[in-house]
A protein has these predicted regions:
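Short, glycine- and charge-enriched coil/turn segments that flank and shape catalytic ligand pockets
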Residues: 12, 33-36, 81, 106-109, ...
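Residue-level signal for inorganic ion chemistry
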Residues: 20, 70, 100, 183
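Fold-independent oxyanion-binding glycine-rich loops
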Residues: 21-22, 71, 147, 170
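His/Asp/Glu-enriched, well-ordered alpha-helical/loop segment
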Residues: 39, 60-61, 66-67, 73-147
Length: 204
């Protein structure tokens, strides 16, 4: 809550500052931690409902510029050490799109275009890479999503070597159907049948 307020104040004063938020921080509260489950251990830690509401408000108003995955996978044995001893972080990449659609787009917080801006165009602009748009002549790095396709998150199906997530078993909307890198289809999901067409994708 305080961070969003300070960022807003800094922007009003003309400071060159940007801010990001992760799907787990606008989806979960500290109340989700009901047992010694290190899949909920992340940095910053989960906060109150009031804090989550402020993050969502910041995204809607534009005070927060980006949605970032904060992808921090860990081996299963590392997260099994218990909440105190386990490392911080979760596998955020493979759930980020569906959580954003489910928690923000479907609830009217962001439009689909605003979601694309927060997750693609604006991050690319901030870090200075010529990506994040569908304009002619730009890099053909594209994700095609079915926003209405529902599925249940299953960490066992993750392509990442890290399977640590607090969202295992959560029903979400928004399935990635195709991933295109440099004009080449490298991933497809046809009615639940996933195919990684080319693991040796070009460097982004």
């Amino acid at each position: 809550e305080d961070s969003v307020r300070m960022i807003a104040d800094a922007k009003k004063e003309g400071m060159d500052i940007t801010a990001e938020v992760t799907p787990h921080h606008f989806t979960l509260t500290e109340d989700a931690i009901t047992e010694d489950d290190a899949n909920y251990k992340m940095n910053p830690p989960l906060r109150t409902r009031k804090d989550v509401d402020k993050l969502i408000e910041g995204l809607k108003s534009g005070v927060i510029d980006c949605i970032a995955t904060d992808h921090a996978p860990h081996h299963k044995t590392e997260k099994e050490r218990g909440f105190v001893d386990a490392p911080f972080g979760i596998t955020g990449l493979e759930t980020s799109v569906a959580l954003t659609i489910t928690e923000l787009v479907k609830k009217g917080v962001l439009t689909p275009l605003q979601m694309a801006e927060r997750m693609s165009y604006t991050p690319a602009k901030i870090i200075g890479i010529d990506k994040g748009t569908l304009l002619p002549g730009k890099a053909a790095d594209i994700t095609i999503i079915d926003p209405d396709m529902e599925y249940v998150i299953d960490s066992n199906t993750f392509a990442s070597k890290g399977h640590n997530t607090p969202f295992d078993g959560k029903k979400v909307s928004g399935q990635v159907r195709y991933t295109i890198v440099s004009g080449k289809v490298v991933y497809s999901n046809n009615n639940g049948t996933e195919v990684i067409i080319d693991k040796d994708v070009p460097k982004l």
